[in-house]
Amino acid sequence: MALSARNQFKGKVVSVRQGGVMSEVVLDIGGGHQIVSLISTSSAKRLRLRKGRPAVAVIKATEVIISSDDER
């Protein structure tokens, strides 16, 4: 997948805490660093985000986007 955003961090999902509407996703990007993002629970399910799965955090000026290769 190619994106125009330059700030992309590959990592592994450490945890996903799902709520009714929003979910907290923690991504380990190495070097002792983690990125935490709130995304919709429907997006977390669609991306199949769960502990140990690879994902990419895309940082934009106003938001953080989490992506995976497994969109349905």
PLM features: what roles do these ranges have?
Residues 1-72:
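Non-catalytic connector elements of ABC transporters
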